[in-house]
């Protein structure tokens, strides 16, 4: 393992992949607890780069309830990235002991330039703060780089930004489904985070879509999107992110691992008008290059 990894500290790790068959997933948890003692279960709400629906808070509640029935002292820790403010609850009200996320995603409202948050049981939050600063100091000291006002303003804007992003994700799903591609989630269905997955089945088309979205960006629209390696990933990535905040995924952006079956993951958007413009531009370019036909442009119900 890398320096400072869990393995270096002799902390064992076991992964259970989430699949659409939720019952079999629960069976894997029970089986794992029978074979191993467990201090903490890390639950990833979003789909990441896998082809599955992101977890709902109701599903997270079932997982946490099951884990606590197997071991009441086990900590349920939820990576809540992309999920904040999407549903009418958050995982900490559904049995999670602690959650964490990024401020260049949902809660930052597209204006917070860096940072993250933790929330949940006070003792666990203080433990995280002690790890961030130093033992004995914890949350009583630290630095926010003078971003207090931006963080509060971003939090104030976040519900509206999430609303626009959700409308945009549904429109992306509808457009690509009308073009004949598999999409997840389907348009006009329940969503538990901001991510819209599209299966393009073609590396050249992935590059074309990412480049078109980059060209419609408010920042760096002139840049070429090229595949590149990134630490922590096992394949090259394409990223379209002409965003005001570098790396922001609460702003309209897309990324894709360059591996079969060539899925692209679209998220964010500060207002639906920008997402419409990006989709219109993409469709115009695909028509011009005869990659789609006018017959495939069905009226949208969105």
Mark where each language-model region is:
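Conserved PLP-enzyme active-site core in the AAT-like
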Residues: 1-163, 167, 173-176, 180-184, ...
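Conserved C-terminal alpha-helix-loop-beta "cap" of PLP-dependent enzymes
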Residues: 177-300
């Amino acid at each position: 393992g890398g320096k400072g990894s869990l393995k270096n500290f002799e902390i064992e790790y076991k992964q259970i992949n989430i699949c659409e068959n939720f019952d079999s997933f629960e069976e894997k948890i029970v089986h794992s607890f029978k074979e191993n003692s467990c201090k903490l279960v890390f639950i990833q709400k979003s789909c990441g780069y896998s082809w599955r629906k992101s977890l709902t808070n109701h599903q997270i509640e079932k997982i946490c309830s099951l884990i606590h029935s197997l071991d009441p002292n086990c900590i349920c820790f939820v990576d809540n990235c992309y999920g904040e403010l999407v549903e009418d609850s958050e995982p900490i009200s559904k049995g999670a002991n602690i959650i964490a996320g990024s401020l260049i995603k949902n809660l930052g409202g597209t204006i917070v330039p860096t940072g993250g948050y933790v929330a949940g049981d006070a003792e666990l939050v203080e433990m995280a703060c002690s790890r961030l600063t130093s033992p004995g100091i914890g949350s009583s000291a630290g630095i926010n780089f003078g971003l207090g006002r931006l963080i509060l303003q971003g939090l104030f804007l976040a519900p509206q930004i999430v609303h626009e992003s959700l409308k945009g994700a549904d429109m992306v799903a509808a457009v690509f489904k009308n073009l004949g591609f598999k999409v997840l989630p389907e348009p006009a269905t329940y969503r538990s985070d901001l991510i819209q997955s599209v299966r393009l089945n073609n590396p050249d088309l992935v590059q074309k879509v990412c480049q078109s979205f980059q060209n419609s960006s408010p920042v760096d629209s002139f840049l070429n999107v090229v595949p590149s390696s990134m630490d922590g990933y096992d394949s090259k990535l394409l990223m379209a992110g002409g965003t005001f905040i570098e790396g922001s995924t609460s702003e309209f952006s897309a990324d894709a691992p360059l591996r079969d079956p060539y899925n692209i993951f679209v998220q964010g958007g500060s207002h639906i008008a920008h997402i419409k413009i990006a989709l219109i531009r993409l469709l115009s370019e695909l028509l011009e290059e005869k990659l789609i036909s006018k017959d495939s442009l069905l009226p949208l119900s969105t």
